[in-house]
Amino acid sequence: MEDFVRQCFNPMIVELAEKAMKEYGEDPKIETNKFAAICTHLEACFMYSDFHFIDERGESTIVESGDPNALLKHRFEIIEGRDRTMAWTVVNSICNTTGVEKPKFLPDLYDYKENRFIEIGVTRREVHIYYLEKANKIKSEKTHIHIFSFTGEEMATKADYTLDEESRARIKTRLFTIRQEMASRGLWDSFRQSERGEETIEERFEITGTMRRLADQSLPPNFSSLENFRAYVDGFEPNGCIEGKLSQMSKEVNARIEPFLKTTPRPLRLPDGPPCSQRSKFLLMDALKLSIEDPSHEGEGIPLYDAIKCMKTFFGWKEPNIIKPHEKGINPNYLLAWKQVLAELQDIENEEKTPKTKNMKKTSQLKWALGENMAPEKVDFEDCKDVNDLKQYDSEEPEPRSLASWIQSEFNKACELTDSSWIELDEIGEDVAPIEHIASMRRNYFTAEVSHCRATEYIMKGVYINTALLNASCAAMDEFQLIPMISKCRTKEGRRKTNLYGFIIKGRSHLRNDTDVVNFVSMEFSLTDPRLEPHKWEKYCVLEIGDMLLRTAIGQVSRPMFLYVRTNGTSKIKMKWGMEMRRCLLQSLQQIESMIEAESSIKEKDMTKEFFENRSETWPIGESPKGVEEGSIGKVCRTLLAKSVFNSLYASPQLEGFSAESRKLLLIVQALRDNLEPGTFDLGGLYEAIEECLINDPWVLLNASWFNSFLTHALK
């Protein structure tokens, strides 16, 4: 059989089939029937797409001899035969550009004319049996299924065969030929019998034991058993009149549908209390960098070497002293920790060869700051299950905080342009599928708008810090390692620049689970005097460590330089997401793309160029107490990016809850604006669900105040 396959099929198909089998750990020499089946399926997919094009009018056309002058685009994108990663990249890319629902399983083709994915089946059994197995496996209304058999039968979703008679006849003839060739060599019977059905997991697996008892206990009222409830759910039609549905449900449900009018909604209640404080893992607008241009020193790129080089650019160091203590901490320890960093950096200077990493001496101040030996001892459950008053720690309720103006300033700053570029053009990822050059064009325009944005600096800083901290946590678990906070950028003239924001010292990091915490102390340079907004810096101890000469319009002025020190912590999963912060670029690019798509579908042509180059047009950015704010397309890109970046920097359960619950209210208000006469029940419950997330988080409080501005203007 193996010889037959190699003679009968095109070498490219044979090679792809071998690769596919190796990917699943199967040997083409042993599983020869499977080898033949994969080749047949590949060939059917290629023949399905061969010669089918879409012309410049968008009409489907068949071209057998290559006419080099025709402006043609392939009608089908071939997904089968690519390696999995590449195949999913193509599928995702198609879904993003066309808005088609993403399939659960990898399909075989995408049809640009009918805008649907296609699953091709080739079976040695009855076509309808195989069709039902496929349909049952993929369970998607959207993916079109087309089955061929070796006997010339076929079956397709809704009897829609996609291709013309002749193209399908070519495939059937080829399959029939393969069958005859096999039969003449005595291979057909074994091949025919070797086909296994699509493996589908049985839907109704039995629930037994504790799970079964829990299921029976948690049934809604009036249901006697789980089966009885399942049958009801399966038969429940989700569309139609809400009141009718409610009456079908249960005697316990008595929801009255209230009309939602302009006068119905009230603003969200923001908490009272002391102003909220800064809780990001590193300083944002207040950060100060010590930088070197065109770095070319020995060991350039090794963080510790870069940091020492940056430190040497500053000459204004002075004896540090505490100017804003941390309320609860032992402040002299923070001061000693900074002095220790300076001393140990000096020690490195005196060594003959600079080491690549620096582990700090485990002094009492660092042990205190990093919470060494502070964690309660873990006891095995077996040893304490007989303790009769065993209980969880009482945790303190968080104290409510009010919205402070600093968080809006932070956001405004994040939307601004800096004078350096923080990403190269290819940072958002290369094109993988040949989906038009439109995608590249949009990406390049977008990159140009955001590459100098401060939010992009925060992304690169976040990626760097999280990567360095996760690396050190795994590589030096027991050490108090010194980690410089570094970023790289290019100046307006295109010169490379390395920046140092300060240092982190990490604590012990035996991180077994994703949520295990590693403590760290951060020490960051700044020119911001903490006494101007003391509430923002509640979690910090701030030292004055030097004087910096700044060039201003009136000449040189000397400004005190501060060091913001605090104890903080993070976990493996948080660092993993921090390393992925570049995704924020992608998320905001997709939001911009959907704006362009909407505009393009109105004008019935691609509007990318006009969108970015028509500088006179303004776009809505957001709501403020003054009304709807508008700005240039670049400003929209940067605002969307900043929102995405802040969602990452200030990620929290409060934000998750607020986003999910406020969205429901947003949709109701939008329905009212669109004159859809929405009705609601238990609106009070929805407000409660939203407001229980408004506790003390600065970013959530800011979003809630934006939401209130939106309500005011939406209901005018």
UniProtKB/Swiss-Prot annotation:
Recorded coiled-coil stretches: none
Cofactor descriptive note: Binds 2 manganese ions per subunit.
Source lineage: Viruses, Riboviria, Orthornavirae, Negarnaviricota, Polyploviricotina
Biological process according to GO: cap snatching; DNA-templated transcription; symbiont-mediated suppression of host gene expression; symbiont-mediated suppression of host mRNA transcription via inhibition of RNA polymerase II activity; viral RNA genome replication; viral translational frameshifting
Protein name as catalogued: Polymerase acidic protein
EC number: 3.1.-.-
Residues annotated for Mn(2+) 2 binding in this entry: E80, D108
UniProt keyword annotations, A-Z: Cap snatching, Endonuclease, Eukaryotic host gene expression shutoff by virus, Eukaryotic host transcription shutoff by virus, Host cytoplasm, Host gene expression shutoff by virus, Host nucleus, Host-virus interaction, Hydrolase, Inhibition of host RNA polymerase II by virus, Manganese, Metal-binding, Nuclease, Phosphoprotein
Sequence motif Nuclear localization signal 1 (NLS1), location on chain: 124-139
Required cofactor(s): Mn(2+)
Record bears the keyword Ribonucleoprotein: no
